Amino acid sequence: MLVYLAEYLTQFHTGFHVFSYVTFRAILGLLTALVFSLWCGPKLIRRLQLLQIGQVVRNDGPESHFSKRGTPTMGGLLILAGIFVSVLLWGDLESRYVLVMLFVLGSFGTIGFIDDYRKVVRKDTKGLIARWKYILQSLAALVVAVFLYSSSTLPGETQLVVPFFKDVMPQLGLVFIVLAYFTIVGASNAVNLTDGLDGLAIMPTVMVAGAFALIAYLSGHVQFANYLHIPHLPEAGELVIVCTAIVGAGLGFLWFNTYPAQVFMGDVGSLALGAALGAIAVLVRQEILLVIMGGVFVMETVSVILQVGSYKLRGQRIFRMAPIHHHYELKGWPEPRVIVRFWIISLFLVLLGLATLKLR
């Protein structure tokens, strides 16, 4: 909203023209979301404690998790609020991409909120029935996929960028809708599965969002896009503000979520953030790159698939417990060691993903 005010004030003082620069607004967006999260965090935690909205811990999980029982959850509300405030202040609300991101964050956040509410407030350990959760996720993702396909005006908006191959960018046609759907829903559930240890999910999310901020900026700049042989997407520049808002809100949340956590994000945070990363990947045409940079999320998801598949087919488990971060806990690794090592892996994969922009 302040973009429009600054545009109006430019006629009185040219200094306000600085607000037209995406990079300047991106920095302000990051700082706004960060300060908002740090300021509102203690208030939200106290409120959640008063309402007795505490984490439900599985009885068959690692014994070290029993001490987490009752820790305030649904802290993802803090992240989403920080992102929304930041984007509404510094983003261009006429941008199709910004509106899509607000819809994704809001819709998947609502699904996660319903799930958390049933688990924590109504004491239903199953939460939202898996079938209904998947149906609601699918509807939201399909709305986004169909809208983006039907409103696309440039060939690059429906091409697939293949890392390491600069001349391989097939036009997807209707396959775009299928790929966008699976990317958004898959990323949403992958981050949700990763959110099992203090700070484990939020830091990789911050890293990937930061990398996508750079990619969105490059995609929105015609000279950089042509140099790197990626689609030039004029609207992608505004995604930088969304990405930096996620980074700022995520870092602010990590202040309270780092080991030992004072609050957990809950499904309201993990489902929304995962879907947001998936949607950003779709918008900048980097779905495959998300698989690389979000490798920790992929690893967690694959471990669950392998565990369930092996048990059903052979009656044997591959890991001591899935997702895989619990496997290492049961092997005797202290929780902070698991978390930091997964962070290091995530940083490596994000840097590898960024390197593919040039290694083509």
Swiss-Prot record:
Its main location: membrane. It is a multi-pass membrane protein. GO terms for biological process: cell division; cell wall organization; peptidoglycan biosynthetic process; regulation of cell shape. It is found in: Cell inner membrane. Pathway: Cell wall biogenesis; peptidoglycan biosynthesis. One of its GO terms (molecular function) is metal ion binding. Pfam families: Glycos_transf_4, MraY_sig1. Belongs to the glycosyltransferase 4 family. MraY subfamily. Catalyzes the initial step of the lipid cycle reactions in the biosynthesis of the cell wall peptidoglycan: transfers peptidoglycan precursor phospho-MurNAc-pentapeptide from UDP-MurNAc-pentapeptide onto the lipid carrier undecaprenyl phosphate, yielding undecaprenyl-pyrophosphoryl-MurNAc-pentapeptide, known as lipid I. This is Phospho-N-acetylmuramoyl-pentapeptide-transferase. It comes from Shewanella denitrificans (strain OS217 / ATCC BAA-1090 / DSM 15013).
